[in-house]
């Protein structure tokens, strides 16, 4: 895996071993996602199911002002920390614009809402399993942490048909890459 664009362009990002249950976003899909999201510069971004930090690091490289990573798996957190530090970033430094929340996604939504946080971009690359997208929909309704005009971008399986018309925001774009769909929703 590598960083596609920005100040860290072409730098390598550590990936999990092939046997690990982590499915990082492929470079081609990541590039397409960020082309759909442009511009990212100056935005506040939350990366849910962050894994190794691949998407959030791409956002940092492209000039995001703040990135919050949400991931609970210890192996992923270790790789994320190594990836950030390998690029000269200290995720533990206060005021550094980088925060790692090492808890389950639903608890992170609650925490961020309680803190009054609102983001320009929400990224989600959940496991390809039944029920996850519906849970994300419910969390977005219960804890509205996406700014007016903000984008919620989710990577999911083409087989996952849970994205309903009742989703809290209208779908603005969708692209297919093999078994993967990138779907973008806009708040307002």
Q: Which residues fall in each region the model found?
A:
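Class I S-adenosyl-L-methionine-dependent methyltransferase catalytic core
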Residues: 1-188
